[in-house]
């Protein structure tokens, strides 16, 4: 008996049946959207394929997707992200609604916890009660004191200069450099040297900086929905996680060394590095921070801030290479305001370099590294001024980068123009403050410019981030001129494959040593 026709017929039958089910699901999905939709919920972005929904359009270019959807549905709408209903609320009102949502109504831990805990460690950030996280943020915030920031400037400059002298990327009088790799190394070395201390910095190698690329890919939108998916980039992220855990083992020895030094000194002197600060902190119930939690907080501090600093510094140099005259203005600003001999940078010098600050602000406006902020809805949330109620089955999505690119707030918004900040001042309303447990802060959501977020999860390292970027860029501009590669205009496109946006690779520029 010939089984081939029988098997072939069975395969064709299964194929026809599967295709039929697929087509029926599409038809039912379309009918549901057009006829049986819930008028009390935000409109759903039209899509043909169930489960997939608008995942592809969102993943390829979130901002293009947001602006196109807003043109059709308004500031508030829902789209399907890998089977999950994700409600977007754009504009300053949306930022207020989501980022300043009440703790009983919105939850960040359920969105980010599964991804961050294996990397950052247990009992910190999204692996602990929110009240404990707020205390941890307070410890970190007060570790970034004025005294500490002042002491960081020469350290950042030294690390940057050391990289220039030792890296093969800067050998000779001119050449090309892959900024993504170079800035990843520089920013992780400066962050480690300042925030973590010399002992921890000495244990970091360029390999650790390289692995941040793999970790970035682990923070992709699909992983927030399907963290268990056996995707290629997850294997690399696991490798990075293992390395990070090995590094965290160094922190207990560092804290032990600190304790021994303090006992030998028999005095009350204070170190300015973050480990020294955390060693002195206690929780509200009187419990000192365990060494394990200090280790995990230090890993978090190193990783969380490095993503943004690396990407933004890369974008800054790409912009300067595309407009070399702006880099020359930055160099001239230093000569004019600091002296022709360009003395070593000090903290007080930063206020004398307003154009440098504006270059950083403008780059943050257009190239914010995080395009999406998510919260899980815990209770039905009525949307003020509308008839909509967002149910607990939804995830909320805020995108402060949309307001930063909105022509209603910024003239010619897609043009990179640092000079726009000379006549524009972003002032936070001091009367609109709240204390989430780590000190009074401005809610901040009424501003269209929120590069560091807002609400209880607002980044507390804003001052350090600005300082780190200012010193790194000022140091590089002293030494080099930057240009685009031959035949290239503008800057590379943005890679949105991770939730941490960055330039499409390779991000290459030409450099020349200043004579």
UniProtKB/Swiss-Prot annotation:
Subcellular location: Endoplasmic reticulum membrane; Microsome membrane
Gene Ontology cellular component annotations, sorted alphabetically: endoplasmic reticulum membrane
Descriptive protein name: Eburicol 14-alpha-demethylase
Similarity remark: Belongs to the cytochrome P450 family.
Pfam family, one: p450
Organism: Penicillium italicum
UniProt keyword terms in alphabetical order: Endoplasmic reticulum, Heme, Iron, Lipid biosynthesis, Lipid metabolism, Membrane, Metal-binding, Microsome, Monooxygenase, Oxidoreductase, Steroid biosynthesis, Steroid metabolism, Sterol biosynthesis, Sterol metabolism, Transmembrane, Transmembrane helix
Residue positions binding heme: 459
Gene label: CYP51
Reactions catalysed: a 14alpha-methyl steroid + 3 reduced [NADPH--hemoprotein reductase] + 3 O2 = a Delta(14) steroid + formate + 3 oxidized [NADPH--hemoprotein reductase] + 4 H2O + 4 H(+); a 14alpha-methyl steroid + reduced [NADPH--hemoprotein reductase] + O2 = a 14alpha-hydroxymethyl steroid + oxidized [NADPH--hemoprotein reductase] + H2O + H(+); a 14alpha-hydroxymethyl steroid + reduced [NADPH--hemoprotein reductase] + O2 = a 14alpha-formyl steroid + oxidized [NADPH--hemoprotein reductase] + 2 H2O + H(+); a 14alpha-formyl steroid + reduced [NADPH--hemoprotein reductase] + O2 = a Delta(14) steroid + formate + oxidized [NADPH--hemoprotein reductase] + H2O + 2 H(+)
GO biological process: mycotoxin biosynthetic process; sterol biosynthetic process
Listed cofactors: heme
Described purpose of this protein according to its UniProt entry: Sterol 14alpha-demethylase that plays a critical role in the third module of ergosterol biosynthesis pathway, being ergosterol the major sterol component in fungal membranes that participates in a variety of functions. The third module or late pathway involves the ergosterol synthesis itself through consecutive reactions that mainly occur in the endoplasmic reticulum (ER) membrane. In filamentous fungi, during the initial step of this module, lanosterol (lanosta-8,24-dien-3beta-ol) can be metabolized to eburicol.
């Amino acid at each position: 008996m010939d089984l081939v026709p029988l098997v072939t017929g069975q395969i064709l039958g299964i194929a026809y049946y599967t295709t039929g089910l697929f087509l029926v699901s599409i038809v039912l999905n379309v009918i549901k959207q057009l006829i049986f939709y819930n008028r009390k919920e935000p409109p759903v972005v039209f899509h043909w394929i169930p489960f997939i929904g608008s995942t592809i359009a969102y993943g390829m270019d979130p901002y293009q997707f947001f602006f196109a959807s807003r043109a059709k549905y308004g500031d508030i709408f829902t789209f399907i992200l890998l089977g999950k209903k994700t409600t977007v609320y754009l504009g300053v009102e949306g930022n207020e609604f989501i980022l300043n949502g009440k703790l009983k109504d919105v939850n960040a831990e359920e969105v980010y916890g599964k991804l961050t805990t294996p990397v950052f460690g247990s009992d910190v950030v999204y692996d602990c009660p929110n009240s404990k996280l707020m205390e941890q943020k307070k410890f970190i915030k007060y570790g970034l004191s004025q005294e500490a920031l002042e002491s960081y400037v020469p350290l950042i400059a030294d690390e940057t200069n050391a990289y220039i002298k030792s890296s093969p990327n800067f050998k000779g009088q001119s050449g090309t450099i892959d900024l993504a790799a170079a800035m990843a190394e520089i920013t992780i070395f400066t962050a480690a040297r300042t925030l973590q201390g010399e002992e921890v910095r000495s244990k970091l190698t360029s390999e650790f900086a390289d692995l941040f690329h793999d970790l970035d890919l682990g923070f992709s939108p699909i992983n927030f929905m399907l963290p268990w998916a056996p995707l290629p980039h997850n294997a690399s992220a696991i490798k990075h996680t293992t390395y990070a855990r090995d590094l965290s083992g160094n922190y207990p020895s560092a804290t032990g060394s600190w304790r021994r030094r303090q006992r030998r000194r028999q005095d009350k002197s204070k170190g300015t590095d973050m480990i020294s600060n955390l060693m002195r902190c206690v929780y509200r119930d009187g419990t000192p921070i365990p060494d394990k939690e200090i280790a995990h907080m230090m890993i978090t501090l190193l990783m969380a801030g490095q993503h943004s600093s690396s990407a933004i510094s890369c974008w800054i140099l790409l912009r300067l290479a595309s407009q070399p005259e702006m880099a020359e203005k930055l160099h001239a600003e230093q000569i004019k305001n600091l002296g022709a001999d360009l003395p070593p940078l000090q903290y007080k010098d930063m206020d004398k370099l307003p154009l440098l600050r504006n270059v950083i602000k403008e780059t943050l406006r257009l190239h914010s590294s995080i395009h999406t902020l998510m919260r899980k809805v815990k209770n039905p949330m009525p949307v003020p001024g509308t008839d909509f109620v967002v149910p607990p089955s939804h995830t909320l999505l805020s995108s402060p980068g949309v307001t930063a690119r909105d022509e209603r707030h910024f003239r010619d918004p897609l043009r990179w123009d640092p000079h726009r900040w000379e006549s524009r001042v972003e002032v936070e309303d001091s009367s609109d403050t709240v204390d989430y447990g780590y000190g009074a802060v401005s809610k901040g959501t009424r501003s269209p410019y929120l590069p560091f977020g807002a609400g209880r999860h607002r980044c507390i390292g804003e001052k350090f981030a600005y300082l780190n970027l200012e010193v790194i860029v000022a140091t590089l501009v002293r030494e080099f001129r930057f240009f685009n590669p031959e035949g290239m205009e503008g800057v590379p496109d943005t890679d949105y494959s991770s939730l941490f946006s960055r330039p499409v690779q390779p991000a290459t520029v030409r450099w020349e040593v200043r004579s």
